[in-house]
Amino acid sequence: MSAAFPPSLMMMQRPLGSSTAFSIDSLIGSPPQPSPGHFVYTGYPMFMPYRPVVLPPPPPPPPALPQAALQPALPPAHPHHQIPSLPTGFCSSLAQGMALTSTLMATLPGGFSASPQHQEAAAARKFAPQPLPGGGNFDKAEALQADAEDGKGFLAKEGSLLAFSAAETVQASLVGAVRGQGKDESKVEDDPKGKEESFSLESDVDYSSDDNLTGQAAHKEEDPGHALEETPPSSGAAGSTTSTGKNRRRRTAFTSEQLLELEKEFHCKKYLSLTERSQIAHALKLSEVQVKIWFQNRRAKWKRVKAGNANSKTGEPSRNPKIVVPIPVHVSRFAIRSQHQQLEQARP
């Protein structure tokens, strides 16, 4: 394998003006014909079967020579077909300096520019053994031409595979690399979405106690012993969201009739039993959890009012002398009147 590299390296290092350029044509015996125009490099590696912009007419091989003479002449000119990965040698220099390669390709008159069909046949050699059974494919020149046509069709499919199997080498085509990058970016984009969704679910579960709770923090601080009489508010909030089917952050929109009945029940009885709660929820077409949380919030407001009244009675300078509890307009006059009576009775 190492003995196949010196001919190509010698060809690249040999002065360009020499008439005895090492090429397939010189091996066959016909003199190298000068190309009609300069070889325009299209940006792809020389062994890929992409056609250049200017295609010089290839010299036909002499029919007098047998096919056996053509077969051993191909491997020395194209030694890289025997090595699929091409980690060292001429192709590694291609990866390091593409500008030098393009200039050499443009100035060579008869070496590579005069044999595009051999390039296609060589590329077909590299791509064809995977889908086709190897061995007897390259015994005849007709097989080379058929494989050259097949290599064109296989190039688009094999390019994406090369981008993953041999991404470090020069053979990875631009299409395969772009597809590989697109897949990686899609994976990277999918992962943060999954993380954000899981984080949002966790955050909703952690902060589910905020749903429909306006004064729950003050309620916990003022009366820690009262928590034994009630179920934890977080489980109640989770139950309310599952029963109502609404978003966790959205408040429950009570109607004026529902608020009126709830205010009446609260002034009659501050704490409800399970049967009373179920009856009120059934009558108002609410869930028991919604009724329970409304009563918790209402008790928190009521205790804040009581705390303000106690401070004013004892003569201690209260930080908030007047606690105004906002009551909606559609609440009954009975509830408003009872609030005013409590505030007036608290004053000396």
Swiss-Prot record:
UniProt xrefs under InterPro entries: GBX-1/2 (IPR042982), HD (IPR001356), HD_metazoa (IPR020479), Homeobox_CS (IPR017970), Homeodomain-like_sf (IPR009057)
Alphabetized SMART domains for the sequence: HOX
Main location: nucleus
One Gene Ontology biological process: cerebellum development
Highest taxon above the source species: Eukaryota
Chain intervals with Basic and acidic residues compositional bias: 181-198, 218-229
GO CC annotations, alphabetized: chromatin; nucleus
Cystines in this chain: none
Alphabetically ordered keywords of this record: DNA-binding, Homeobox, Nucleus, Transcription, Transcription regulation
Low complexity bias: start-end ranges: 231-245
SUPFAM superfamilies, per database record: Homeodomain-like (SSF46689)
Location relative to the cell: Nucleus
Gene3D superfamilies associated with the record: Homeodomain-like
Matches recorded under CDD domains: homeodomain
DNA-binding region: 247-306
Entry keyword annotation includes Calcium: no
Annotated region described as Disordered, given as residue ranges: 59-81, 111-139, 179-251
GO molecular function (one): RNA polymerase II-specific DNA-binding transcription factor binding
Function: May act as a transcription factor for cell pluripotency and differentiation in the embryo.
Protein name in UniProt: Homeobox protein GBX-2
Organism: Homo sapiens
Gene name as annotated: GBX2
